[in-house]
Structure formats: C-alpha cells, structure tokens
C-alpha cells in the first residue's frame, strides 16, 4: 500500500528504503562512496522459459549521497528511474548479448576451462567490490491454503559474502 501511494513497485520502494537505511549507518569515510545494491532479476518474467534451471540476472541501483538531494523521495525517484531504464527487455537483452559475445569470442573459446573459471572469478570479485549489499525480493510466495494457517514466517539461506536482505510477501 505504501509503495502504491508513492507510485512505485514494492521492489523499487524496498530498494530505496534499504539504500537510505545503509546510508544512515555509514561512517564519514564510507559516505564518500555511493551505496550500491545488487538486486537479482527473475528473467522468466521478461524472457519466458520452460527451463527449471536458475534464469536470472541482476541490476545495481545505487545513490551517491552528499550531492544536495538526499531525502528519501530523492532516492526513491532516482531508484525508480534506474529500474525503468535498466529493466527493459531491450536493455537486459543487450547485457546478455554482451556476455554471450565473450563466451563466443574466438580466442576465449579456445582458452582452457580452468583459466576461464579463474578469470570469471576475478571479474566477479572486481565487479562485486562496488556493491554495498544485496536485496532479493522473492515476490509473493504461494502455499496451499491448508498449510497457510501453520505458517508464521519463511526463512531464507543465502551464500553471499555481503549483507543481504531477502523479502517476500505471503497471505
């Protein structure tokens, strides 16, 4: 209801709220860098797939505080704009095509798998350095009605090294 009042999705609202919450806890030294979240994106909603394998990507919305406009509404508007620009089918397809181009590169195609795996790990670590935390909105969880009365909460276990907040809706 609160997110609707602001004219944004729950994911946009929660992302902006988490960015602001992290900023409130930052030291003066940390404030020099932007707060950047890694937000997983379920690609099945954009590219229908029958595969049971994980089919996701991620976006990295963020905000650089200290440039004058630091209210929640400012962060919310910037986050909304980021989601609109980066969650289009075209933008995600472009990103996926760039990753596929690396995979099909003539020289990289012939590189030993062990070398490729090391390079991928290094690249992931470099990209991850800028990320402050991870926010996973698992969306609505549906359970059979006969089980619903017994459910008080859901637990989620993740394997990220960063601070991660996982949220879901139920009921």
Predicted regions span which residues?
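Acyl activation and transfer enzymes in specialized metabolism, enriched
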Residues: 1-27, 171
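Acyl-thioester-dependent acyl-group transfer interface
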Residues: 23-171
């Amino acid at each position: 209801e609160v997110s609707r009042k602001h004219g944004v999705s729950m994911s946009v609202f929660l992302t902006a709220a988490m960015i602001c919450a992290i900023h409130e806890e930052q030291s003066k030294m940390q404030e020099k860098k932007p707060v950047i979240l890694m937000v997983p994106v379920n690609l099945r909603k954009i590219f229908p797939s029958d595969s049971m394998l994980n089919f996701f990507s991620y976006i990295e919305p963020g905000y650089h505080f200290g440039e004058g406009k630091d209210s929640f509404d400012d962060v919310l508007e910037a986050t909304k704009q980021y989601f609109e620009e980066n969650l289009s089918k075209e933008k995600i397809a472009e990103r996926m095509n760039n990753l596929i181009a690396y995979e099909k590169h003539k020289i990289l195609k012939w590189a030993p798998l062990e070398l490729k795996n090391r390079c991928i790990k290094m690249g992931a670590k470099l990209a991850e350095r800028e990320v402050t935390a991870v926010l996973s909105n698992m969306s609505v969880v549906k359970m059979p009605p006969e089980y619903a009365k017994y459910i008080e909460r859901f637990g989620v276990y993740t394997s990220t090294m960063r601070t991660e907040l996982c949220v879901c809706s139920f009921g």
